[in-house]
């Protein structure tokens, strides 16, 4: 069976991930006119730029959908977001600022939950608005086929007939108007935005040029912290975790993770926390650039990692970072449910996250500027009395340290011999300043 259909399968049911925007509206109407039977599925991901979810399925019915459903994906999305925080599943960082993989997390949820809903309706052909140059086309492909083994893929944006007739937004708008729908294009921004309640992605158009900075972006989850005219008073916030799960903000306990994430977004958003500018490698290895918002994820991540460093030992922390980066890359590639990802997730959640219990107090200022004011946990292995510089009882004596240092003589001797061996082989050069062979300075090479 052919998995990807290049032309519209007339007379068959086609499920379309329907956002209500111009692209999917025109595609749905066009498919109905060409003889297909479109079913519309809209994911409620708590998008911060969407204020009336119930209106979206109604519009789909007006444009010719056989049926239209709104699927509430918020609970599952937040669950996956918390799992990503527990695992440190983030691999794109620049200058210490992190991209929290909020779009890949959203695709993992919509790519499974929408296809599962389609399967309930006997719909085994799926279309969405992802382009052939991006990451989402592969993410949706993988998650869709994982969920429904009989699934076939039809994307109007890969159909030459659709492209020839409605190849641009102007043509789509004219098509909608000609069909009796007073659909006007929204005001064109200098970039495109995709969002869910975990974060927002701003990319393309002017942002493809690296001389266009974050300053052209209008945040939808935060504030323009770079604009000095925007008043942002400092704010003290506490975050509490129990066994790796965020449970309270500023002393208020949440039984609903969705409400907790919304409040974390509000707190972090007041400061522009979690905004970053990243150059990344797409799945196809080409580089792209995005500006990201994730105020709630950033707030929880900072508190989680503060507790992590006070609770776990050095090797565990090192593996958390190493495995987290591996897992983040798998998540980015649309492999969040693959066996290699599940293996990493299980270890990180079982042996790392389970011990993260405690409370962190921070002072948030502008953007990603913050201070940690206090860290409290019954599980802390940080114990100041062990290494206090003040006189008093100690867990080890000066003689103990002398013995430990004496044992270092063995590897110090070995290292010295290796350095002079490298010098003899011409790999290092003598240094009168240090008395040890060293790597030749780059500025001295070729002189």
Curated annotation (Swiss-Prot):
GO MF terms held by the record: argininosuccinate synthase activity; ATP binding; protein homodimerization activity
Keyword Ligase applies: yes
Where is L-citrulline bound in this sequence?
Answer: 99, 135, 139, 192, 201, 203, 280
Which InterPro entries is this protein grouped with? Arg_succ_synth_type2_subfam, Arginosuc_syn_C, Arginosuc_syn_N, Arginosuc_synth, Arginosuc_synth_CS, Arginosuc_synth_type_1_subfam, AS_cat/multimer_dom_body, AS_multimer_C_tail
Q: What class of enzyme is it?
A: ligase
Key words of the record: Amino-acid biosynthesis, Arginine biosynthesis, ATP-binding, Cytoplasm, Ligase, Nucleotide-binding
One of this protein's GO BP terms? L-arginine biosynthetic process
Q: Where does L-aspartate bind?
A: 131, 135-136
Compartments where located: Cytoplasm
- Write one Pfam family the protein is assigned to: Arginosuc_synth
User: What metabolic or biological pathway is this protein involved in?
Assistant: Amino-acid biosynthesis; L-arginine biosynthesis; L-arginine from L-ornithine and carbamoyl phosphate: step 2/3
Which residues are listed for ATP binding in this entry? 17-25, 43, 129, 131, 136, 194
Q: State which Enzyme Commission number(s) the record gives.
A: 6.3.4.5
Listed GO cellular component terms? cytoplasm
Q: Does the keyword Signal apply?
A: no
Report which reactions are catalysed by this protein. L-citrulline + L-aspartate + ATP = 2-(N(omega)-L-arginino)succinate + AMP + diphosphate + H(+)
Oligomeric state and interaction partners are given as: Homotetramer.
Q: Show the NCBIfam families listed in the entry.
A: argG, PRK05370.1
Instruction: Name the family the entry cites.
Output: Belongs to the argininosuccinate synthase family. Type 2 subfamily.
What HAMAP family does the annotation carry? Arg_succ_synth_type2
Protein name per its UniProtKB record: Argininosuccinate synthase
In its UniProt entry, the species of origin is given as Salmonella heidelberg (strain SL476)
What is the taxonomic lineage of the source species?
A: Bacteria, Pseudomonadati, Pseudomonadota, Gammaproteobacteria, Enterobacterales
């Amino acid at each position: 069976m052919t998995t990807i259909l290049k032309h519209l399968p007339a007379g068959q049911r086609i499920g379309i991930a329907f956002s209500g925007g111009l692209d999917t509206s025109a595609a749905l109407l066009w498919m109905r006119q060409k003889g297909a039977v479109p079913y519309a599925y809209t994911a409620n991901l708590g998008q911060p730029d969407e204020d009336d979810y119930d209106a979206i399925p109604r519009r789909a019915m007006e444009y010719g959908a056989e049926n239209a459903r709104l699927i509430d994906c918020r609970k599952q999305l937040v669950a996956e977001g918390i799992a990503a925080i527990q695992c440190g599943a983030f691999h794109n960082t620049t200058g210490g600022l992190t991209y929290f993989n909020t779009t890949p997390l959203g695709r993992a949820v919509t790519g499974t939950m929408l296809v599962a809903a389609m399967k309930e309706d006997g719909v085994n052909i799926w279309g969405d608005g992802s382009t052939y140059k991006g990451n989402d086309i592969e993410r949706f492909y993988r998650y869709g086929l994982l969920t429904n083994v009989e699934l076939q893929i039809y994307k109007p944006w890969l159909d030459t007939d659709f492209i020839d007739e409605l190849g641009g937004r102007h043509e789509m708008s004219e098509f909608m108007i000609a069909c009796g729908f007073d659909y006007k294009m929204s005001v064109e921004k200098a970039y495109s935005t995709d969002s869910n309640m975990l974060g927002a992605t701003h990319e393309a158009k002017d942002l493809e040029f690296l001389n266009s900075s974050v300053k052209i972006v209008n945040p939808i989850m935060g504030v323009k912290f770079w604009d000095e005219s925007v008043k942002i008073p400092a704010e003290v916030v506490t975050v509490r975790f129990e066994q790796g799960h965020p449970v309270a903000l500023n002393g208020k306990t949440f039984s609903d993770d969705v409400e907790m994430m919304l409040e974390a977004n509000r707190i972090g958003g007041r400061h522009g926390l979690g905004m970053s500018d990243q150059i990344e490698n797409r799945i196809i290895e080409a580089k792209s650039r995005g500006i990201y918002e994730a105020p709630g994820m950033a707030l929880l991540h900072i508190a989680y990692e503060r507790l992590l460093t006070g609770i776990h030992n050095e090797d565990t922390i090192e593996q958390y970072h190493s495995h987290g980066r591996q897992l983040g890359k798998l998540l980015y590639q649309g492999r969040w449910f693959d066996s290699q990802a599940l293996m990493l997730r299980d270890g990180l959640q079982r042996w790392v996250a389970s011990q993260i219990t405690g409370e962190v107090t921070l002072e948030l200022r502008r953007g990603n500027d913050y201070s940690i004011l206090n860290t409290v946990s019954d599980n802390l292995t940080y114990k100041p009395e062990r290494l206090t510089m003040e006189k008093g009882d100690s867990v080890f004596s000066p003689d103990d340290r002398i013995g430990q240092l004496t044992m270092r003589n063995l590897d110090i001797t070995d290292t010295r011999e290796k350095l002079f061996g490298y010098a003899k082989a011409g790999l290092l050069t003598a240094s009168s300043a240090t008395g040890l062979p060293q790597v030749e300075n780059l500025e001295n090479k070729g002189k």
